[in-house]
């Protein structure tokens, strides 16, 4: 048989073999998409265990009409755009293959509307080539995905589905994990037209324990020891059950989350088990709900088809950090249990649980940024320090550049024709649209360039600052806001709150969305250039800057932010320099025409050449 390119539907079905294991896999992927879209309410309707119908409706930001067809295409995503993004993933989804895979093994319909659109649009793919049809529809702001007749065209996969009850138990377990992670999101789950679970969004404080008790049971809550542990860039929060009172039923509660992503990680389980081993029997398992936050550059989530596992770059450090955090709490445990809220919470209708069928709970999801007031506040170990930005974090595994990069380095920077700043201004001449060819990196942060036989030296941090300012400055439309997976809640003074309210419209144009109450402000979304910054440091500094201003111009605020952003590169590579210059040439063509002295300096080789000739 000759080598040939597979049809799109067959290729998607092969990918679905890894992504879509059962109905619960579909629910997980779609709910994570809703969370990435900034949804605060998600309604999930299931029929016949998910084999007949899976419907996910959210109130997120929605999808534009022009992007609906792309949403159903393979490897199309809004989560990442470059290799650096892949090596510092902060969203739940990033591969852009879930919807394409699901639509290839079911009858999938996607209906969505953004706040800017007057009407909603519906898209579905059909046929051998998976052609996407888009038509008008009625729908509020947000997105609804309907998955009908899962595995209808793959009878072998459908044959391996378990009973309706078992498949729904798997779905129930997935929703349980997500509800534990996102206390700020309301999640409703129904099966065959009946409401089964209602997890209401709860504010900060004691009500988190109410939701914890509703999901994990009062027995776990009564034995739960709160953890709040921090060292450098690592933070551990959550609860671990007192091992002296752990029962087989409690031992099934094992949820861990890494940067908001539910995980099953042997390293984390081993660290917790080791900390509890003196008090656990040989056949006992610890019970815990833990949230680990780590520099995204120091963890690789792209190592498992279903994103169930991660790899830590400094696994021993992470292991010892978790071990010390859990051990410290166990050594300081008190006899009084966690405070229970006296207000009764309406109990959702229960269904018979089958946690064994759903697998042992090694998964977990992220808590909101504001930490629960812990029962124990262990003092940081000697030499520890408050969380700091990650200026020296190197993206990824420091991978060796392959042949593709060697070819890239030999290629001049892209010669794109930028739009003139003003309509009446003539287009730039072709030979002035590029800074030139990158020859090498000098002193880790300068690029040596060659153009038309002339040599110049360019400051990469200054170029990066100009690029960030261009990305942040709003044009005809506001800068796109990226919802934060974990909203940032900060305490502010009356003066700072007043300044924020005056600057709210300007900040909205920059893609910064927030809500304020009496004494706090909650940052809900930021523009893309800020996603990889340490917002716990940057946002308070921005608020302090705004409090000193009387006029709030988006351009001035964008300039201040650009000057205060931490560089993503401690040491520049040639590939990074080439990418940066291509972006600067595209977004800042005026810099190519008249570069400022702090950005580009000519290097005069004539004295050196003359000296060589005189010898």
Curated annotation (Swiss-Prot):
User: Compositional bias (Low complexity) spans?
Assistant: 373-387
List the PROSITE patterns hit by this protein, alphabetically: DNA_MISMATCH_REPAIR_1
GO BP of this protein: mismatch repair
Which first-to-last residue range defines the signal peptide?
A: none
For this protein, the parts annotated as crossing the membrane are none
* Entry's Gene Ontology molecular function annotations: ATP binding; ATP hydrolysis activity; ATP-dependent DNA damage sensor activity; mismatched DNA binding
HAMAP family given in the database record? DNA_mis_repair (MF_00149)
Which family does the similarity line name? Belongs to the DNA mismatch repair MutL/HexB family.
Q: What function does this protein fulfil?
A: This protein is involved in the repair of mismatches in DNA. It is required for dam-dependent methyl-directed DNA mismatch repair. May act as a 'molecular matchmaker', a protein that promotes the formation of a stable complex between two or more DNA-binding proteins in an ATP-dependent manner without itself being part of a final effector complex.
This one is known as DNA mismatch repair protein MutL
**Which organism is this protein's natural source?**
Escherichia coli O81 (strain ED1a)
The coding gene here is mutL
């Amino acid at each position: 048989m000759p080598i040939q390119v597979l049809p799109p539907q067959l290729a998607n079905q092969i990918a679905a073999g890894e992504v879509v294991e059962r109905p619960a896999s579909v629910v997980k992927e779609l709910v994570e998409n809703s969370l990435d879209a900034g949804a605060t309410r998600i309604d999930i309707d299931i029929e016949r265990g998910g084999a007949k119908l899976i419907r996910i409706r959210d109130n997120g930001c929605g999808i534009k009409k022009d992007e609906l067809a792309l949403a159903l295409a393979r490897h199309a995503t809004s989560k990442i755009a470059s290799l650096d993004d892949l090596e510092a993933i902060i969203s739940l989804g990033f591969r852009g293959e879930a919807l394409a895979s699901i639509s290839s093994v079911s009858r999938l319909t996607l209906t969505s509307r953004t706040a800017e659109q007057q009407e909603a649009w519906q898209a579905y793919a059909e046929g051998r080539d998976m052609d996407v049809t888009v038509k008008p529809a009625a729908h509020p702001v947000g997105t609804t995905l309907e998955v009908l007749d899962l595995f209808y065209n793959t009878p072998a996969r459908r044959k391996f589905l378990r009973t309706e009850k078992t498949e729904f138990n798997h779905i129930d377990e997935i929703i349980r994990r997500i509800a534990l992670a996102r206390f700020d999101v309301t999640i409703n789950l129904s099966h065959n037209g009946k409401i089964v679970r209602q997890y209401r969004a709860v504010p900060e404080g004691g009500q988190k324990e109410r939701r914890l008790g509703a999901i994990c049971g009062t027995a776990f809550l009564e034995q739960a020891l709160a953890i709040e542990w921090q060292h450098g860039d690592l933070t551990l929060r959550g609860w671990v059950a007192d091992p002296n009172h752990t029962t087989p039923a409690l031992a099934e509660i094992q949820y861990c989350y890494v940067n908001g992503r539910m995980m099953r990680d042997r390293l984390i389980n081993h660290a917790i088990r080791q900390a509890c081993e003196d008090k656990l029997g040989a056949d006992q398992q610890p019970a815990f709900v833990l949230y680990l936050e780590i520099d995204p550059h120091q963890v690789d989530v792209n190592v498992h088809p279903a994103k169930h596992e991660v790899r830590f770059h400094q696994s021993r450090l992470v292991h010892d950090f978790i071990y010390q955090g859990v051990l410290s709490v166990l050594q300081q445990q008190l006899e009084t249990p966690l405070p229970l809220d006296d207000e009764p919470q309406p109990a959702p209708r229960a269904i018979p649980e089958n946690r064994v069928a759903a697998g042992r709970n090694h998964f977990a999801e992220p808590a909101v940024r504001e930490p629960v007031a812990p029962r124990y506040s262990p003092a940081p170990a000697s030499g520890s320090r408050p969380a700091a930005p990650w200026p020296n974090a190197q993206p990824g595994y420091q991978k060796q550049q392959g042949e593709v990069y060697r070819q890239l380095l030999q290629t001049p920077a892209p010669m794109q024709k930028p739009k003139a700043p003003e309509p009446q201004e003539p287009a730039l001449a072709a030979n002035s649209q590029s800074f030139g060819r990158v020859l090498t990196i000098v002193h880790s942060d300068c690029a040596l360039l060659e153009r038309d036989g002339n040599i110049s030296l360019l400051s990469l941090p200054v170029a990066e600052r100009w690029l960030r300012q261009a990305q942040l400055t709003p044009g005809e439309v506001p800068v796109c806001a990226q919802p934060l997976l974990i909203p940032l809640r900060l305490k502010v003074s009356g003066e700072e709150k007043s300044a924020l309210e005056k600057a709210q419209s300007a900040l909205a144009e920059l893609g910064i969305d927030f809500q304020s109450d009496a004494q706090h402000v909650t940052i809900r979304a930021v523009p893309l250039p800020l996603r990889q910054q340490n917002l716990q440091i940057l946002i308070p500094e921005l608020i302090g800057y705004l409090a000193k201003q009387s006029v709030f111009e988006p351009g001035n605020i964008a300039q201040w932010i650009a000057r205060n952003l931490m560089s993503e590169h401690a040491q520049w590579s040639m590939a990074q320099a080439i990418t940066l210059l291509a972006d600067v040439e595209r977004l800042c063509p005026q810099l190519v025409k008249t570069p400022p002295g702090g950005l580009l300096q000519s290097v005069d080789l004539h004295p050196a050449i003359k000296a060589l000739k005189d010898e």
